[in-house]
Amino acid sequence: SISPHEKACYHHIEFPSYKGVEVEVHYRPSFLLCFWHNRKLQKYYESVKEEQFSHRVMLGEQGEIAIPTVEFNLIFQLTHIYAHLMNEGIGLRQLLDYYFVLSMLSVNCEMLTSLQKELKELGLWKFAGAIMYIMQEVFGMPASRLIVPPNEKHGKFVLNEVLEAGNFGRHDARNRFGRSQLGHNLQRVYRDIRLVRYFPAEALCEPFFRIWHFFWRLKHRSQSL
């Protein structure tokens, strides 16, 4: 344990606020709620980590820094947006981030074939199609920069979620269960029911992941004592 008051979860560690500044250390880029797909995602991150750590660019006159590759960000940012959809809500800021990732991409057939194969194996194909629909319809992204064919049905659903809920679901009038712990969990189930038609693997696994994560936190909290 680094300090007596940090809170660890599967994705990050929250440290106590220091002079009003919240500190959250991410030790895992992202995760998926479907256990099968998440296992593949973590293997993917493990396989490309050395490339990401060694990918360096010049930051003006400030020197050299390491940043992820565009190819990595295409998957990482997509899973980050997906997590927002499944858990609380997406804001336009996440979608705008993805627009700029796509804008930086130099498309070639070999890279696109590899990327599309990865998206299918990770269970992200339909969600990627939904995001491509929004990129084209809302942000005016040229078709030549889309990484998968746009999925209008799923895209319209996701766009409606963005407009109804906003970032972290702060503006979602459908939140009807209050802000208590019980209300929060009931709201998650209600959300899963709404999402299961479009993204069944993630929505069906969400309650089981939540139970698994509860015991994961208990186990790792006891190990840090």
Predicted segment positions?
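Conserved NTP-donor binding/palm subdomain of two-metal-ion nucleotidyltransferases/polymerases, i.e.
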Residues: 2-225
